[in-house]
Amino acid sequence: MASQQQTVREWSGINTFAPATQTKLLELLGNLKQEDVNSLTILVMGKGGVGKSSTVNSIIGERVVSISPFQSEGPRPVMVSRSRAGFTLNIIDTPGLIEGGYINDMALNIIKSFLLDKTIDVLLYVDRLDAYRVDNLDKLVAKAITDSFGKGIWNKAIVALTHAQFSPPDGLPYDEFFSKRSEALLQVVRSGASLKKDAQASDIPVVLIENSGRCNKNDSDEKVLPNGIAWIPHLVQTITEVALNKSESIFVDKNLIDGPNPNQRGKLWIPLIFALQYLFLAKPIEALIRRDIATETKPAWETRDVGDRK
């Protein structure tokens, strides 16, 4: 959980939360420090228009990323850093990965370049709860993330579903709709990322988020979901658990971004190929030549020459 080269401001936005939420957040930050974790970097990714920037603003408690329903997302990633009680929180907001029904390779390359020499402690993969179905685009996004940062990034991942203050269709119970929506999305993510079901990476936690100012509140003035959960402390608690799991954080270096060099990879096989050629081709041919020489009948002129010399 490396430190990042970034202007770090005091996390004053935490004071805008309800006192009960502040207490829980400071307790969670204290738990991280007890584990010698003094900084945390969260990478926020997903399709466009799913609420990534709003989620960053909600976690920080400030309007740190500009958002507008009438404007497209910013073309470049933004890292916001805040410090509190000796702990530094870095959150990286990124542009959507889909453009015109395909992966936006330009946006993906910009994101990878931005992340060079940074460490990803948690991936927050954002989508919407009120999306009724999954499709091939979800699979493409999961594949693009995996191809860029490796399968290991899903060991440090959380799926976050926004627009959680949502009434399911046809009177379906809220928890049942959430369960079905979560499993459908996780199944596509596993498929796109080529994850095995029995692998740790398949056990990706799913959290609910409601960024609207109209979010309901409990008696402690905390923002709560229809299931009664105070979502900001629950999200930060899940982030803490993922950050402290046994999987390693992802350090983004040039080799990770560029992938294996096919030319260099081919060079590694050259000595083995030569050895096999010698064993299975050159050596047998050499033996055949020697045998032919040994059994070859000498021509008459060579025999005469030998007799004349005598």
Curated annotation (Swiss-Prot):
Domain (AIG1-type G) ranges: 37-260
Region feature (G2): 72-76
Residues annotated as binding GTP: G49, V50, G51, K52, S53, S54, E73, E210, N211
EC class (word): hydrolase
EC number annotated for this UniProt entry: 3.6.5.-
Cellular component GO terms held in the UniProt record: chloroplast outer membrane
GO molecular function per UniProt: GTP binding; hydrolase activity; identical protein binding; protein-transporting ATPase activity
Main location: plastid
Region called G4, residue ranges: 162-165
Family: Belongs to the TRAFAC class TrmE-Era-EngA-EngB-Septin-like GTPase superfamily. AIG1/Toc34/Toc159-like paraseptin GTPase family. TOC34 subfamily.
Function summary: GTPase involved in protein precursor import into chloroplasts. Seems to recognize chloroplast-destined precursor proteins and regulate their presentation to the translocation channel through GTP hydrolysis.
Name used for this protein in its record: Translocase of chloroplast 34
Gene: TOC34
